[in-house]
């Protein structure tokens, strides 16, 4: 079914209230259409500024990647976490929006390879994050 993304910042606030030492909350947003067709995105919430950013965006509107013909869902979350950690620790990704954009693109592409290791290059991830905003991934 459809996700009500407007509620996810509230979920992140509840997590932050329970775990006082965290600065950010990241949540992946998966809409399962079928076993091989998912819509995929994420939210990154900053505790101190009480702001949330979503990815991918089409202008000001959240528009999840439409992943058809999923090869393997295993590793999608790990790939998101790895992409987010990489982006947060690399000076090229200065904003929370840049960071979550990269992480979501990395995890989206991970759905196109077998197993839980993301073989995609940084250039491939950035091409998706910066390129086709229609939300359709073709591999």
Predicted feature residues:
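Conserved phosphate-binding/catalytic region of the ribokinase-like
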Residues: 1-139
